[in-house]
Amino acid sequence: RKNEILGFLKNPLNDLCISRPKSRLNWGIDLPFDDNYVTYVWFDALINYITAVGFEQSDDKFEKWWPASYHLIGKDILTTHAVYWPTMLFSAGIPLPLSIFAHGWWLMGDSKMSKSLGNIINPMNLIDDYGVDPVRYYLMREMVLGHDSNFTMESFIQRYNSDLANDFG
């Protein structure tokens, strides 16, 4: 994924518009200098990373949690987090995360899991039925970091039976 970002950065970068007209959006944080616009959702969402750990509110808390050693994100939002977010931090004089890692997707039936598609599994139900350790084991065993992985109940039960029940008893 590093090469994706390096390739992106080889192209000229345009200014990032951080506002959206209210005529297109009926929600958002108002801009204090223009009543007709709201803040672009990714801009205000990214700021949450530092405000949640005390930026401009608690120096002790902020210094405890920032800079982030690892910034773990989904591969579909890599550019936002590896280009725009560091740019925002740098311009504010805030240290950048030390490492950014983009994880793959859990797929269900070869499609990205999505609440709107209804192709999801509730992990809490899985934990209730099988316990937290078997679920952790499956997730770590089946997903190669940075790549997509397909989840099926059949593969979960197969891994549970073959590795945990048979090998570890």
Annotate the PLM regions:
Residues R1-G169:
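Structured secondary-structure scaffolds
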